[in-house]
Amino acid sequence: MKHFEANFDGLVGPTHNYAGLSFGNVASLNNAAATSSPKDAAKQGLKKAKALADLGLVQGMLAPQERPDLHTLRRIGFTGTDAAILNKAAKEAPALLRACCSASSMWTANAATVSPSADTHDGKLHFTPANLVDKLHRSIEPITTGNILQATFNDSRYFKHHQHLPEHTSFGDEGAANHTRLCEQYGHAGVELFVYGQETTNPSAPRPQKFPARQTLEASQAVARLHQLDDDCTVYIQQNPDVIDQGVFHNDVIAVGNQNVLFYHEQAFLNTQAKLTEIKRKFGESAIHFVEVPTSKVAIQDAVKSYLFNTQVVTLPSGEMAIIAPTNCQENPAVFAYLNELVTLDTPIKQVLYFDVKQSMQNGGGPACLRLRVAMNQDEVAAVNQHTLMNDAQFTRLNLWVDKHYRDRLLVEDLADPQLLLESRTALDELTQIMKLGSVYQFQR
């Protein structure tokens, strides 16, 4: 049976804007109040997704969230018509309105943690939506995320969906952005790496001092239990608190893995050598490549600015691996020089392909943020909602949909415009028909 690693990219929503909501994310803060282009953002994402499909990879799309989120605004006391609620929120609590208008669900690396059937006791593919409790604008996502995942992976013979973890900082969970999987082949049992920022039940344990550690050890352990993973196929690694304080808010900003390659910065983890030894022991006899990038070649600041590690490492049909990188990596001399050297080294990585995802990058999300990886066999791929998979017809359909519904420019002050709410709901209602999702949004119920 054939096995694949599919990428499910987040479709950028109609309210994509730069509100600077993500403390700890340098790009998000630096671009606060800039003018965004929802249309360009969506098209950049679709273009990248289509390019990966054209490379022969299984590529899907996940629908965006309903924004502005009137349901949340009503929960926190705003009343009246939709237009009245938007007007009141803009005047009385503009920060809360901005949080309820974020298009952050585009970064599907934070949508959920996924464990493939080859790793789980029951032989099913498991999904746990991330609770994202550290950031208000993301903490309102998990229920709809669960709805969208269940509408996408909708065959209970193959897919097991869990509720997100309890909404408390002890279980702060940021999903696949702090999780990677190493394996010889996608269909073989692998080693799942859970990277965390702090251990909340141990006050004396290391933790960052400037920026929050969004992922807890307790959350990672809970997800592993839910997914029925054996201890001999899981490794828990603490991210270096110093790099969190330098803007590395998720592990996928400082490390990425694919099959038998772990690509990481030398400052990424605590107790690196001991953890690499544990990974190697649990990985077994097969060859594994630890590709460590030294600070002398790429400083943390350059890694964060370029998103060198927020790249996708993918296996092409030829068996070679390629890095899917943002064009920002070409524009950083140190990073570009390193990548040109990397493809000449004795590793499976032999190509670097560059994509313009600047609308996402300016909000702090690179190619890896935009995708949720799902390793599947051919029967599981066949069981996926086929209307969520990328192909020529769907690419054309979704681009026409974006052209019809999305604005060319959006400012933060536009978020209170009742017309934007109407445009967004009209677009999403049509999208659920294109992707055959059913009624996944509050306004449809």
Swiss-Prot record:
Catalyzes the hydrolysis of N(2)-succinylarginine into N(2)-succinylornithine, ammonia and CO(2). The lineage of its organism: Bacteria, Pseudomonadati, Pseudomonadota, Gammaproteobacteria, Alteromonadales. SUPFAM superfamilies: Pentein. NCBIfam families: arg_catab_astB, PRK13281.1. Pathway: Amino-acid degradation; L-arginine degradation via AST pathway; L-glutamate and succinate from L-arginine: step 2/5. Homodimer. It comes from the Bacteria. InterPro entries: AstB_sf, SuccinylArg_d-Hdrlase_AstB. One of its GO terms (biological process) is arginine catabolic process to glutamate. PANTHER family: N-SUCCINYLARGININE DIHYDROLASE (PTHR30420:SF2). Its EC number is 3.5.3.23. Substrate binds at residues 19-28, 110, 137-138, 214, 252, 363. Keywords: Arginine metabolism, Hydrolase. GO terms for molecular function: N-succinylarginine dihydrolase activity. This is N-succinylarginine dihydrolase. Pfam families: AstB (PF04996). It comes from Shewanella halifaxensis (strain HAW-EB4). Belongs to the succinylarginine dihydrolase family. The active site is at 174, 250, 369 (nucleophile). It catalyses: N(2)-succinyl-L-arginine + 2 H2O + 2 H(+) = N(2)-succinyl-L-ornithine + 2 NH4(+) + CO2.
